[in-house]
Amino acid sequence: MATSPWPLAPPTVLGYFAALVAEDEGFALLEAAICVAQDDHPELDVQAVLAEIDGLAAKLKARLPADASALRRLQSLNHYFFVELGFAGNVNNYYDRGNSYLHQVLATRRGIPITLALLYCELASQLGLTARGVSFPGHFLIKLRLPQGEVVIDPFNGRSLSREELDERLGPYRARQGLAGDFEVPLGLFLQAAPARDVLARLLFNLKEIAHTAEDWPRLLAVQQRLVLLLPQDAEQLRDRGLTWAELGRPAEAADDLSAYLLSRPDAADAPALRERLAELQRGGAPRPL
């Protein structure tokens, strides 16, 4: 479990997140994912949540002999996580943002695939299993490597998925992307382990979509602040944050972000409309929808 990097005054919520994701590789994914909830729950003790997860892993680890095979550890983990602890997908309220907050998933035992996968992979890691998240189109999955071969699990319901089932799930995506027929992309390319930054981005994109759909501009801005820090090379995050600043009546901040986007993407398809919006903001005119 990571210890706090802040020996003196505590950081701001956003500063804490920025420090966690500053490293190019190997940042503390679980800790960063937990602290996302501090936008709604600023008093959340991230270290206490990490300790709770460690406690769950320790209980299962104590039941297993030191020489337990990888297959036995996997079977024990699946029963413990999905049956005994009762973790499952939140089928009744899938789009509740609480499903993206790991401390709430721990409390309710309900979540979405990506948060369930984060918890499962952490427990697997503490059992000595190699488990990674997979950004499968439309549904986050878990991939484990065993001496007997590779296992793919749907964290929403705990089912192991066969190659045929995975191919079937890919069918609609391949059709939409024009990847069927002679140009079909091998299944294995869709089952590559997702880097930590991509996993965290996918979690934040879920929250971004929820807030945008609800036109909840303050919450949307909070998520976008994190995305700009997490994906500093992605100019579209600046553009989107700029538009949210405009919705919140903050023209100076909106103009800064839109200017930065247009500087990096002068030939983007939306550049002409955004230049008009930027001119309005700089004149002090009322913002209008694009």
Question: What are the functions of these language-model segments?
Answer:
Residues 1-290:
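A structural boundary/capping signal
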